[in-house]
Amino acid sequence: MKDLKNVFRQIEKVLRRSSWFDDGWEIYNRGVYMQLYKTNWHNQNQGGIHFETFIEPREIKQKAFPICMHAEEDCPSQDEFIQQFLTLERDRIKSWKGYQLGDGYSICKRTLPLNFKNLEQRLMEEFNRLRQLEAGIEEILQRVEY
């Protein structure tokens, strides 16, 4: 089995080297748990808007792990943000293979099989897919913040 902390460190390195990363993106990496978010998404304490994945003992046992988008308690006008965001992006998310709309602060989620063979590549693909939601997040944040 691969060293998962090392896998997450490698993913962080690749993300940071991406051409788009310097446009206000941040990473919170705690071993086998990672969030990707923009600086204006109210996620300074990991409780705002972010894309998230983790592979902890439960996921290893289940041989599957999630990648998701959350709008947690630090998101301004959280309920309104979620409602407006889903109105805007629901169809796009539903068109993505394997993605499900969530409940509460969990906007959407995909559960991936835990295959160590191309784990880094799979996670990069999913983070890049979720990044397509950036413009919608920005648009709705502007509406609910003012």
Language model region names:
Residues 1-111:
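Polyanion-binding interface signature
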Residues 83-146:
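Charge-biased C-terminal accessory regions appended to nucleic-acid-, cytoskeletal NTPase
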